[in-house]
Amino acid sequence: MRFQTPLVPARLVRRYNRFLSDAVLEDTGEEVRAHCPNPGAMLGLKDAGQRIWLEPNDDPKKKLRYGWRLVELADGHMAGIDTSVPNKVVGEALAARAITELAAYGTIRAEVKYGTNSRVDFLATEPGLPDTYVEVKNVHLRRAEDWAEFPDSVTTRGAKHLAELARMVEAGHRAVMLYLVQRTDCTRLRLAPDLDPSYARAFDAARATGVEMLCYGTLIDTGGVTLGRALPVDPAAQAPQNED
């Protein structure tokens, strides 16, 4: 997934509600307001003074001139904060058969109705193979070592998706929860039960039913975000308690 226009560097002033942020452009010193496409907690990714990357908006119908896309991390690493990006990245990867566990599927449909008033992110079908329901989750929390963690706050919706996928398995289909780590300084994934114990319980129940838990990293630069390598999932690993 490539960004539509070249990104510009800025310094974050503040993120003052779920969808708005202020930043100072590095090149001009102008303070601008930018759309923050992330309703989550964004732990460690919204500190004043952090170097961020904004995408200029050339659509006159939009109210804000910039959209916040990336946070620059230590040692040259990057984190993507746009929660719409994972579905785009995974959609491109599925179409290119780049996800090993799903490479046998030739037909991919997005936003297909299923379950109870839900839409699955992707439905993969192929003659002779079970229909596969794929949900995608954005991951960008890191608190210790090289562990990515999910979720970064309570997600009732996320637990519902796990239950819906479990029901698909019980109905004879295949179901996959795919966690996409949108930061380049993590090499493995674990749950964060201290932040949402209900989600951890839903994860265990879904996995016991047969829902497959996959995780992939990403390659991130100021040009875009693409699929990286498969990462191990270790839900039993102990997350740190109440650290920012």
Curated annotation (Swiss-Prot):
Q: Matching InterPro entries, A to Z?
A: SfsA (IPR005224), SfsA_C (IPR040452), SfsA_N (IPR041465)
One GO molecular function term of this record is:
DNA binding
- Cited Pfam families: SfsA, SfsA_N
Q: Which domain of life is it from?
A: Bacteria
Q: Which family does it belong to?
A: Belongs to the SfsA family.
PANTHER family registered for this protein in UniProt = SUGAR FERMENTATION STIMULATION PROTEIN A
State the protein's name.
Sugar fermentation stimulation protein homolog
